[in-house]
Amino acid sequence: MPKRILQGVVVSDKSDKTVVVKVERRYSHPLLKKTVRQSKKYKAHDENNQFKIGDQISIQESKPISKDKRWIVVKDSVA
């Protein structure tokens, strides 16, 4: 099974080797017939502490690194 890759924005970099990434998705609401935005925050492993708040990055699924971290930073995505 291929690993999922998501794109998002770094909203926190306070933890060592960890960034919090906000991923936003859009979908059509079945009853209201309008586009709805929904966001979720993921903790991702940043080995070199190189990403700062506001950076656009891509994260990829991985094996569990800690209690909450199951994603790793793959690359800096330019939007």
Curated annotation (Swiss-Prot):
One of its GO terms (biological process) is translation. SUPFAM superfamilies: Nucleic acid-binding proteins. GO terms for cellular component: cytosolic small ribosomal subunit. Keywords: Ribonucleoprotein, Ribosomal protein, RNA-binding, rRNA-binding. Gene3D superfamilies: Nucleic acid-binding proteins (2.40.50.140). Pfam families: Ribosomal_S17. Belongs to the universal ribosomal protein uS17 family. This is Small ribosomal subunit protein uS17. It comes from Bartonella quintana (strain Toulouse). The gene is rpsQ.
